[in-house]
Amino acid sequence: MKKLAFLACILTLFTLLPSLNVKGEYLYSQGSEIKDLYNEKIEAVAVFNGSNDSIYVTDEDIYLMSQVVYAESCGEPANGKLAVASVILNRARAGGFPKSISGVINQKNAFSCVKGGKVVHKGKPDVIPDSASYVAVLDALKGKDPTDKAVFFYNPVISTSQWMKDIKKANIKTIGNHVFFLVK
């Protein structure tokens, strides 16, 4: 029954997107105004970092982000999923990380769910994200960020990374089972 409901959500999502007459790309502008996400003249999502450098986000990036959000937070509340999506965008905007979504996600040891360039969940590659994961990614692109610009997160109960446990943290937020933070 859950599989049927999931398939119905995915089919609905993929049925609605083309009807919006979108050319596969969206726009997000950080700041006081959010641009129309469905303006058909837009060629990519422009996510701006502090130095006004743009990070362009394609449909493939949105799918990849949704896969990671699902694999890292499938048992978390909506705000936890949004927080994971926000960390990906925050890293792309911050110094010291790759400047693209795929670069951030595929950076070595960045996300425990990424193995050999594939997003893995419970040992199975090619994760298919659920609609809640897509919603979280799109909300993050609209500027929602419950982490207040965190670039790291971990689950203290299951984490095997001593670095995550020992590092001096700033801006700590606990959302669901994860701890989100910046490094001091």
Question: Model-flagged regions — what are they?
Answer:
Residues 43-184:
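Bacterial extracytoplasmic/cell-wall-associated proteins, especially those involved in peptidoglycan
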Residues 1-59, 176, 180-184:
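N-terminal secretory targeting signals
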